[in-house]
Amino acid sequence: MKKINLAITGCMGRMGQQLIKSSKSDKNFNLVALTENRIINKKISGIKPSFNVENSFKASNLIIDFTIPKCTFQVLKIASKLKKRVVIGTTGFTKKEEELIKRYSKKIPILKAGNMSLGI
């Protein structure tokens, strides 16, 4: 099986940190990009988190988003442009935002599943 090149958004949050840890221990994933909404001046698992989301996503096959709704739509806009698959773990969307996600899902594959944190 070919490895999945993975980008994780919201890499400094609890779920982002868990995803980094899990992806590093799973031979099916190759962690290629980390993004955060603020500049981080240290490497995490050998990768420096980027504020430039579009450049970060180019090498990925799959983007996992654990940010906030506002950031999720920035992720979806870029992922749609680059034709990338997205897993959304972000919660707290309004009904209008849920409809917008459905529209994006007609352009790119999206798996949306809230409450993926450990213990749920």
Residue ranges and their predicted role:
Residues 31, 49, 86-87, 110:
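Hydrophobic beta-strand scaffold residues
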Residues 2-6:
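Extreme N-terminal starter segment of soluble prokaryotic enzymes
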Residues 12, 35-38, 92:
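Residues in the short beta-alpha loop(s) of Rossmann-like NAD(P)-binding domains
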Residues 22-45:
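NAD(P)-binding Rossmann-fold cofactor-contacting core
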